[in-house]
């Protein structure tokens, strides 16, 4: 998986390991080092995973770039950086891992997206939300095209989750405001997302593909 160093990512790793998976993290400081904003680095990381571990049965993309910019301030470099990490990197990794999955007639691809795709909370999230929309479209078309090979492609869309990173850009009042809009009146924690990912990687989700699980406390009722 990618993005295993953050609060949500590390919770996903722990959840997968506790479910019996052997987890390999692709990240700047992961078990396999990579700069996901650079295509060559991403492809090299995929090759290293296959060389060192032989196969990938479940691929989770949890890494994300959060560069903030509203329309008036957005520049090409910022937009391209977000797209490189959030959209292109999972494509190159899926491209590398799916041939083996298809050969074994089994594979799971799980993208971590965001509920902000349906209800954008702030103009400065333009690059981030655009990338999550693109990733959602990719998830659906891959679900259709890879299904005949026994590969499912799904996504988890977390809501505002109480993490150190989220606390740097959200006040206590903002956390409370979002929680007030949720059907479930509690703050979301990283294990909420991790549990959804673990389910999608499990035998219990064998009939699911092309679907998004919203782990957002019922903020977006879909």
Report residues per predicted region.
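Conserved NAD(P)H cofactor-binding loop of Rossmann-fold oxidoreductase domains
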Residues: 62-67, 217-218
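Substrate-binding pocket helix/loop in short-chain dehydrogenase/reductase
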Residues: 70-71, 78-83, 178
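Active-site helix of classical SDR
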Residues: 94, 131, 139
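Alpha-helical segment proximal to the catalytic Tyr-Lys
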Residues: 99, 144-145, 206
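Short C-terminal tail/terminal secondary-structure segment
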Residues: 119, 198, 209-222
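Short, small/polar-rich loop/turn modules that mediate ligand/substrate recognition or access, typified
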Residues: 147-152, 208-210
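A conserved structural motif in NAD(P)-dependent oxidoreductases
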Residues: 182-193, 204
């Amino acid at each position: 998986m990618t993005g295993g160093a953050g609060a949500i990512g590390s919770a996903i790793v722990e959840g997968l390991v506790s479910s019996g998976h052997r987890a390999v993290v692709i990240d700047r400081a992961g078990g396999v080092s990579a700069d996901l904003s650079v295509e060559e680095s991403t492809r090299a990381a995929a090759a290293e995973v296959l060389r060192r571990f032989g196969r990938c049965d479940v691929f989770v993309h949890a890494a994300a770039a959060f560069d903030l910019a509203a329309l008036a301030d957005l520049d090409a470099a910022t937009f391209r950086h977000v797209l490189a990490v959030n959209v292109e990197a999972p494509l190159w990794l899926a491209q590398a891992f799916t041939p083996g999955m298809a050969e074994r007639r089994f594979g799971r691809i799980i993208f971590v997206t965001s509920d902000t795709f349906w209800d954008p909370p702030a103009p400065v999230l333009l690059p981030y939300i655009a990338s999550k929309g693109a990733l959602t479209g990719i998830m659906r078309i891959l679900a259709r095209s890879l299904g005949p090979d026994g590969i499912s492609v799904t996504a988890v869309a977390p809501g505002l989750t109480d993490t150190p990173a989220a606390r740097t850009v959200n006040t206590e009042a903002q956390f409370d405001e979002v929680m007030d809009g949720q059907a479930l009146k509690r703050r979301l924690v990283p294990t909420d997302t991790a549990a959804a990912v673990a389910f999608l990687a499990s035998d219990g989700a064998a009939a699911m593909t092309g679907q998004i699980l919203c782990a957002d406390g019922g903020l977006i009722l879909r």
